[in-house]
Amino acid sequence: MSQRKLQQDIDKLLKKVKEGIEDFDDIYEKFQSTDPSNSSHREKLESDLKREIKKLQKHRDQIKTWLSKEDVKDKQSVLMTNRRLIENGMERFKSVEKLMKTKQFSKEALTNPDIIKDPKELKKRDQVLFIHDCLDELQKQLEQYEAQENEEQTERHEFHIANLENILKKLQNNEMDPEPVEEFQDDIKYYVENNDDPDFIEYDTIYEDMGCEIQPSSSNNEAPKEGNNQTSLSSIRSSKKQERSPKKKAPQRDVSISDRATTPIAPGVESASQSISSTPTPVSTDTPLHTVKDDSIKFDNSTLGTPTTHVSMKKKESENDSEQQLNFPPDRTDEIRKTIQHDVETNAAFQNPLFNDELKYWLDSKRYLMQPLQEMSPKMVSQLESSLLNCPDSLDADSPCLYTKPLSLPHPTSIFFPNEPIRFVYPYDVPLNLTNNENDTDNKFGKDSKAKSKKDDDIYSRTSLARIFMKFDLDTLFFIFYHYQGSYEQFLAARELFKNRNWLFNKVDRCWYYKEIEKLPPGMGKSEEESWRYFDYKKSWLARRCGNDFVYNEEDFEKL
């Protein structure tokens, strides 16, 4: 009889807990939707919440008493579930109580961005966090599709990423309400989670229905298209395929002799072209000599006499005897002798009596090595082919030659082979932008500072490694800084971010900050507006906009 009565008491209590939680949720929703300026109504709702939570706390104490006994094993899971629901309501009431005790413009309210009283701001924050999570997941999937060379999935992801970034920017700039994003949240989430399923059906016009569809190629500042100007996902894919195909098969522009005579060539590239042109190599007349791209001259591999052309012409030896003659360079004994004689007469080192005999003996001993071989074994051909094809792509290939003039270089050398040590220090009289003019360098690396004088220049900016760091993007620099702690490379990455990219390092939270200055249209009261961004290296690995509560304190930032 007592067991039956206990079961009846448990059922009655669980019914009261269910009703109490429903009443608590209704009051809590009213509190969240109430205007923060209506303090009297919010205080009344707070007292109602307090009354309901006290009832639930009594029920929780009774549930804890029953759980300590062994007579309720069949109801133990149900009692634990209701206990957790009551404790969840207690936590929510604590947050409401803390929110009501916090004054609007107190130090705690200004320094804590999580304390948001405006319901619209709460919705906006939730949607911004949702889009951030979707972008992070899509970026991970995009990297996988790019590694698998899946062009169709890559194009779809690029389209969605571009539109989500546009929505995120509009939300942050208050150009878009969070309600449309909340309405289509399930559709966006469905694509992010199920886009690789075989039965997946894509919602092509989701961003068009939201009124903010853009093309991936357009910038974030572009206004959303309206009416007939809006394009579907299928048309964007077809246009992107048409854009990609000519990029892969773009014809190289021929440069005539007159164009080459008037085109300024960097000293490093000019010396490389002279050394290559001095070596007789088979050149096809139908192939353009070199292509002009990005203000630098790159040589076409098909025009150089490589072991590949040597092997292919050896295969045609029986068909055409005239082609066989191209494989063997002419006798250059006289040319080498004249070069050595010229070096002996012009260089001051050969006139020194202390080194005169030794240098002449050294040149005579190297004479045989400087003469190209008339014939080459197949094994040597294969070794040269593999070595040239696997030659490292040096990032300092455009470094200027600091010697006056080399001795004869009869054998062809890859133009991408490094001609300077990796940490070679340049003298002050050699400018750092020999191969690129000042405007191109500023545009390429995003610099807005003027060229520094020799006194302001330091030794680190004159090393090849520092010049390499100038070519890295922000993701690479941040990766080196956070993952190569205590190394020389970390110092160079920090120096590049601070001096050339204008980022500031905060010693307190160990984050990098960047100040943006946006010019406002006339009539706004002020000409420009400042905003701060920080690099989130802990969660998203993205540069995010700082909140309105961010205060710049110069003492917290490191100075290099």
Swiss-Prot record:
Biased composition (Low complexity): 273-288
Modified residues (Phosphoserine): S377
Cell compartment(s), UniProt: Cytoplasm; Nucleus
Coiled-coil region: 3-26, 37-71, 124-177
Swiss-Prot/TrEMBL keywords: Activator, Coiled coil, Cytoplasm, Isopeptide bond, Nucleus, Phosphoprotein, Repressor, Transcription, Transcription regulation, Ubl conjugation
Region (Disordered): 212-330
Biased composition (Polar residues): 215-237, 299-311
Gene Ontology cellular component annotations, sorted alphabetically: CCR4-NOT core complex; cytoplasm; nucleus; P-body
Modified sites of kind Phosphothreonine: T306
Chief place where the protein resides: cytoplasm
GO BP term (any one): deadenylation-dependent decapping of nuclear-transcribed mRNA
InterPro entries: CCR4-NOT_su2/3/5_C_sf, CCR4-NOT_su3/5, Not2/3/5, NOT2/3/5_C, Not_N
Pfam families on file: NOT2_3_5_C, Not3
UniProt crosslink position (Glycyl lysine isopeptide (Lys-Gly) (interchain with G-Cter in ubiquitin)): K338
Subunit structure comment from the entry: Forms a NOT protein complex that comprises NOT1, NOT2, NOT3, NOT4 and NOT5. Subunit of the 1.0 MDa CCR4-NOT core complex that contains CCR4, CAF1, NOT1, NOT2, NOT3, NOT4, NOT5, CAF40 and CAF130. In the complex interacts with NOT1 and NOT2. The core complex probably is part of a less characterized 1.9 MDa CCR4-NOT complex.
Family in the record: Belongs to the CNOT2/3/5 family.
Function, in words: Acts as a component of the CCR4-NOT core complex, which in the nucleus seems to be a general transcription factor, and in the cytoplasm the major mRNA deadenylase involved in mRNA turnover. The NOT protein subcomplex negatively regulates the basal and activated transcription of many genes. Preferentially affects TC-type TATA element-dependent transcription. Could directly or indirectly inhibit component(s) of the general transcription machinery.
Note: Present with 5110 molecules/cell in log phase SD medium.
Protein name: General negative regulator of transcription subunit 5
Native organism: Saccharomyces cerevisiae (strain ATCC 204508 / S288c) (Baker's yeast)
